């Protein structure tokens, strides 16, 4: 991925460096599937807590190229399962995800004892960000 300028990265952090809703598009057999997901942005990627057996993850296993859209932002990226949410990892700090998603994370919807509760990373490859009349492409 081409790096964001420092200004664009700051806009990304302000808009998406917290619990936010984005649309995530996957494809199966040339048919697009779009859904809203809770995500947060950090260092060129979005992170989503999801279930390994969900349709989105089945689609991503067969075709990791995804599209996302948020507030004045569209992009493509590669979806990768980082594995079980409770596993220690270097790429993503689960404590940060728990903090970011604190408003809803313990509402019973997510079972952290289930090893199919995973972190989906969408590493951005290209996109367009608009902010106050400025167009940032990467």
Labelled PLM ranges:
Residues 1-18:
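Extreme N-terminal tail/first-helix region
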Residues 2-3, 74-138:
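Charged, gly/pro-rich active-site loop segments
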Residues 13-14, 38, 109-112:
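Short secondary-structure boundary/capping segments
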Residues 8, 23, 32, 44, ...:
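Generic preference for well-ordered secondary structure
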């Amino acid at each position: 991925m081409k790096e964001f300028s420092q200004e664009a990265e700051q806009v990304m952090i302000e808009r998406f460096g917290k619990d936010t809703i984005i649309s995530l598009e996957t494809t199966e057999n040339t048919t697009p599937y779009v859904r809203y997901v809770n995500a947060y942005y950090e260092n060129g990627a979005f992170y989503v807590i999801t279930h390994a057996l969900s349709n989105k993850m089945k689609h991503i296993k067969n075709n990791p190229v995804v599209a996302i859209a948020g507030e004045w932002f569209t992009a493509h990226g590669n979806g990768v399962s980082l594995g079980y949410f409770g596993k220690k990892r270097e790429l993503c700090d689960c404590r940060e995800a728990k903090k970011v998603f604190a408003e809803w994370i313990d509402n019973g919807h997510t079972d952290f004892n289930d090893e199919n509760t995973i972190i989906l990373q969408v590493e951005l490859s290209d996109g367009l960000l608009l902010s106050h009349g400025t167009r940032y492409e990467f």
